[in-house]
Structures are given as C-alpha cells and as structure tokens.
Amino acid sequence: MIEFLQHKEATIAREILAVQIPAYIKETEIIGFDGIPALQEKVKDIQASHERFAGYRKNGKLIGVISYEKNMHYLTICRLVVHPDGFRKGIGRALLQFVIDHNEDAEKIEVVTAENNTPAVSLYTQAGFQKAETVKAAQGLLLSVFHLYPKRKVEIILYNEKWAECFDEEKERLKLVFGPEIIAIHHIGSTSIPNMAAKPIIDMLIEVRSIEAVSQFDEQMKANGYTPKGENGIAGRRYFQKGGNKRTHHVHMYEQGNPAIERHLLFRDYLRAHPNIAKEYAVLKKQLAAQHPDSINQYIQGKDEWIKTAEENAKRWKKGRNNANGSIVCYNSENDENGGFTL
C-alpha cells in the first residue's frame, strides 16, 4: 500500500531513515562513491524537510520512500529509495507512478541519479523519462538529469451548467488584474455553448486596448496561477494557461480590432444558434477523444477540417442574417495553445 507520510512526526522520520540508509549504502556499492549527502541525514533533518513524502508499506512495514518538491507545475523528485529487502519487486516503479498520478497538473518532472546507477537509470527510462544532460559533481561523480513531460489526457465530459459560473468568477479576477486595459471579456469555446460536451476548460477571450501592454501583467497572472506563453504561435495574441497538464482555463488576449476576435465569436454564436450542428461537433469530439486519449495534438488535428468547414458556414450564416436584418450580428469561437481550437 502506498500512502503519503507525515514526515514531521519523529516516528515516521525514523521509519524513513530505516529505509533510506541501507538503500543509499547499497547505492554507494553500485556507483563506487560514498559521499552521498543523504547518508548523513538525521531524524531532525527529515522532519525539517519541505519535501512531500510518500511511502510503500508491506504488512505495515515501510520498505520504500519517495519525496518531491513542486513549484507551480514543475516537480522535482528528491529521493526514491527502496530497502534492499524490497529490491526487484516493482516498488520503485509503483512509488514513481503514485507521484505522477497525484500530480496530474505537472508539466515537467525532473530527477537526478548517478550516471552509473544502472538500476535507477533503467527505472526512469522505462517510466518514460528522457536524459536531458550530464552534470559533473564531487570527486568526478557524473550525474544524469532526467526529464519527463507528462502527456495531457483528452477528456470530454457532459455539459456542466457551472461552467458559466466559473467563467463569471474568473472574469472578475482578471478584471482586477488588467483593470482599464480591458475592453471586453468573452466566454468562448465549447464550455460556452449550452449542452455541448467538452473538455472541462474555461476558454476566455479578452479584448484589450494595447496588446503590447499585456506583458507587464505577467507576474500578476503568475500569482493567479497562470503560465504566460506569449504569442505561442499566433501573431498578435497573448496566451495564458492555468492548471498545468490538468488544465482549467485558457486566456486568449487580442488588441481591439484584431480579426481573430470576430472569428472566435462568430464560431461560438453559430453553434449556439444551431444545436444540431453543435451536437454533430460533440459526437466528433467524443470519437476523437476515444481514438487519441493521450494525444492532444492528434485530437486537435482531427477537428481541423470540420472546424474550417463550420467557420465558412458561419460566415454565410452571418451574411444572410445581416442581409435579412440590415444590421450586424454577434459572433464567436475559440483556440488552443497550439493555434488550433480547444472546442
């Protein structure tokens, strides 16, 4: 059984050391280096740690430990130790997967191990980590730095009436950030279309007075949980995302008058006005999500032709309404971080 550990408690800290010390002693034999700092740790050092600990227990006895630190959506594994009695039983892999599963918003996971620690290198490689660099440490010891970039899961769920409330709440927060720079904030994307099945991500389009002024608010956006992505492939846009790989919000910002604003809004309003077409689109999204659950890019690419056709139909629909009413109507749509639609 794997569980999070309350390492501030002395009894738990002693249990952690009882696993850690023999594990690192074994590692010194493997790598031929006895200067591993963790071998000098005491109970008080474990208790004072800011890392989060999890442990693997068998029949109540702790035989494996993993700890990590997290900064926003970047996670660093600080230690992964298994008591020699638990070697080659899949305990290290289980602990690693536990951390990955409990940090779905992580965009990058880093771990460092001795280059000649063959068991550890094999474990991380099999788990999907890729070697990023080699670092020379004390006494000529070479360390391998591994990175894992977890894939975003494609999740399509039934329409939730609370999405509109989520938009309204976030809208008020963003108004406090950007203040008078904002001209208008629109709810776009599938969560803005009644009864539309969607990825549970609130897409927001913000019209601003000056797109060049947006970057001065990057730190405030970070404080609100957003990651600034700049243009991110679309000229004239400023894009922010929230929630890491467990995405919750996308913010697309354009300067007033940018044609992308009308394109996004027209697409939204076209689907709102045509429930049958929206239903057809929802069916396509569910099919693509089932076919490509681990590839957001393939999911987006699969929608591309449908969206292009719908956009052309939306333009004709708008033109027909303008001709009939003698006035200009509303519009809308949406966009993902890769330049494709999040819808």
Swiss-Prot record:
<dbReference type="InterPro" id="IPR000182">
    <property type="entry name" value="GNAT_dom"/>
</dbReference>
<dbReference type="InterPro" id="IPR016181">
    <property type="entry name" value="Acyl_CoA_acyltransferase"/>
</dbReference>
<dbReference type="Pfam" id="PF04229">
    <property type="entry name" value="GrpB"/>
</dbReference>
<dbReference type="InterPro" id="IPR043519">
    <property type="entry name" value="NT_sf"/>
</dbReference>
<comment type="similarity">
    <text>In the C-terminal section; belongs to the UPF0157 (GrpB) family.</text>
</comment>
<dbReference type="Pfam" id="PF00583">
    <property type="entry name" value="Acetyltransf_1"/>
</dbReference>
<feature type="domain" description="N-acetyltransferase">
    <location>
        <begin position="8"/>
        <end position="144"/>
    </location>
</feature>
<dbReference type="InterPro" id="IPR007344">
    <property type="entry name" value="GrpB/CoaE"/>
</dbReference>
<keyword id="KW-0012">Acyltransferase</keyword>
<feature type="region of interest" description="UPF0157">
    <location>
        <begin position="135"/>
        <end position="343"/>
    </location>
</feature>
<keyword id="KW-0808">Transferase</keyword>
<protein>
    <recommendedName>
        <fullName>UPF0157 protein YqkA</fullName>
    </recommendedName>
</protein>
<dbReference type="GO" id="GO:0016747">
    <property type="term" value="F:acyltransferase activity, transferring groups other than amino-acyl groups"/>
</dbReference>
